[in-house]
Regions:
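Membrane-embedded alpha-helical hairpins and interfacial helices in multi-pass inner-membrane proteins
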Residues: 26-31, 46-152
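Interfacial aromatic-anchored transmembrane helix boundaries in multi-pass membrane proteins
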Residues: 12-48, 53
Length: 153
């Protein structure tokens, strides 16, 4: 939010990469996590700067939590649901039909419950810490010296 879209995407993606390096959390899900959380950071950086940022950041946190959860479920949904069930991905079917199947899969696996927990926790933390944290980040942004890279040939 404070440092912009590009920084948000890079920070989100790289933080998951370094987290995986430290914790050994490498797997086929890592690139999807990096892209999904990078998009969350990108979206936060694209939000307009307003006088009361909590009013904007809390709804964004709810939307981003459910979007992140859906993106993370999408990467493995065709494999976990199998073939031929009412929740499985059907190649060649329309978007609406597969979307209905995906929503059924999310409900059946409890994915929406995890997303709801993520949304509530994130919103509560933003509600409690936003004022102090944003003031600190804005102060750091004002004190930082950042220059654009240019080709000096």
């Amino acid at each position: 939010y404070v440092f912009g879209s590009s920084f948000g995407f890079i920070l989100g993606s790289s933080s998951l990469l370094f987290s995986a390096l430290i914790s050994g959390g490498f797997g086929p899900w890592l690139p999807f996590q990096m892209i999904a959380i990078g998009l969350v950071g990108f979206g936060a950086g694209a939000l307009p700067q307003i006088r009361t940022p909590r009013l904007l950041l809390i709804p964004y946190a709810v939307l981003a939590s459910f979007t992140f959860g859906a993106l993370m479920t999408m990467w493995n949904w065709p494999y976990l649901a199998g073939l031929g069930s009412s929740v499985s991905f059907v190649p060649g079917a329309g978007v609406a039909e597969n979307l209905i199947r995906f929503i059924r899969f999310e409900i059946a696996t409890g994915g929406l419950i995890w997303d709801l927990g993520r949304a509530v926790t994130t919103s509560a933390l933003i509600g409690v810490t936003a004022t102090t944290l944003l003031a600190t980040l804005k102060r750091a942004a004002n004190r930082a010296v950042v220059e654009k890279l240019t080709n000096r040939n």
